[in-house]
């Protein structure tokens, strides 16, 4: 017989008993006492309403070892592990926390799952560093430096230290490199300077900057730039040498401190009688003479 329990909300209101005969037919019996065979004794049997919580099995590495092998020293190492100390450090649910942390740390460094954490934003750091001893460059990723000698633990992440041979390895540039034109004339405050292409730091190589000063009207500055005039050995006043190019600045205008004044000209002739003078109506005899102060006192 088999027992089936219809559990709804943690309660079992209607138990069903299914009986199977020899031919394989099933018969349902209602309102019958529930009888189930259990391998557990009655004292250890748990109620059906409570779920069973499986306990974590205890993991002990030293269970398969014999007590004699632990107490007696081994032939290879010659070390002796007392049995009473191992029994004192046993943990009911597995190895002690210190051993578990060491095993997890070793597994994290040796496994490839630690590489997934380096993809997080803000924690990626790829640096190429040279050793102090002058060896090949090394690629460092993250926070802990893993070397052939051992493992150095950092504060944040684990670093991967890979030695690279010199002359090998490709590292893409960090940003796009945009190269400008070979030479661009610069115009500042009316002074045009044109630097020839090449290394401008090396002097005395026959490459000098051409500087011109436009002194003409306020039109487009390109129209005021003087053009180079080729000078050959046939030009008078110059020594016999190869053909050279030079700039001859234009002559400055003559400075005139006086402003341009109009020229004086004679007035046009007047056809007609001359106008009488303004003082012609006044006669000298008709004007009274001023009285002197001496006559009043006399």
Curated annotation (Swiss-Prot):
PANTHER family: PROLINE-RICH PROTEIN 32 (PTHR37343:SF1)
SS bond partners: none
Name this polypeptide is given: Proline-rich protein 32
Species lineage: Eukaryota, Metazoa, Chordata, Craniata, Vertebrata
UniProt cross-references to InterPro entries, sorted A to Z: DUF4645
Region (Disordered) residue spans: 36-56
Superkingdom of source: Eukaryota
Pfam families (alphabetical): DUF4645 (PF15488)
């Amino acid at each position: 017989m088999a027992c089936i329990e219809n559990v709804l909300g943690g309660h079992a209101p209607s138990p069903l008993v299914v009986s199977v005969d020899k031919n394989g037919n099933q018969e349902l019996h209602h309102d019958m006492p529930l009888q189930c065979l259990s391998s557990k004794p009655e004292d250890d049997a748990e109620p059906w309403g409570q779920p069973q919580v499986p306990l974590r099995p205890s993991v002990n590495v030293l269970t398969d070892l014999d007590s004699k092998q632990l107490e007696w020293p081994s032939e290879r190492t010659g070390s002796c592990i007392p049995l009473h100390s191992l029994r004192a450090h046993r943990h009911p649910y597995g190895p002690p926390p210190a051993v578990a942390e060491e095993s997890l740390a070793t597994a994290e460094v040796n496994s490839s799952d630690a590489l997934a954490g380096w993809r997080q934003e803000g924690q990626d750091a790829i640096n190429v560093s040279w050793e102090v001893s002058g060896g090949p460059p090394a690629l460092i990723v993250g926070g802990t430096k893993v070397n052939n000698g051992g493992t150095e633990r950092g504060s944040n992440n684990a670093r991967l230290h890979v030695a690279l041979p010199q002359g090998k390895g490709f590292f893409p540039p960090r940003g796009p490199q945009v190269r400008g034109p070979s030479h661009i004339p610069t115009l500042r405050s009316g002074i045009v300077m044109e630097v020839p292409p090449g290394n401008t730091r090396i002097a005395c190589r026959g490459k000098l900057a051409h500087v011109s000063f436009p002194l003409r009207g306020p039109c487009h500055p390109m129209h005021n730039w003087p053009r180079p005039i080729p000078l050959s050995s046939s030009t008078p006043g110059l020594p016999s040498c190869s053909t050279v190019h030079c700039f001859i600045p234009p002559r400055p205008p003559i400075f005139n401190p006086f402003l341009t004044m109009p020229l004086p000209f004679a007035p046009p002739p007047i056809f007609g009688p001359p106008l009488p003078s303004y003082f012609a109506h006044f006669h000298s005899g008709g004007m009274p003479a001023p009285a002197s102060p001496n006559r009043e006192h006399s």
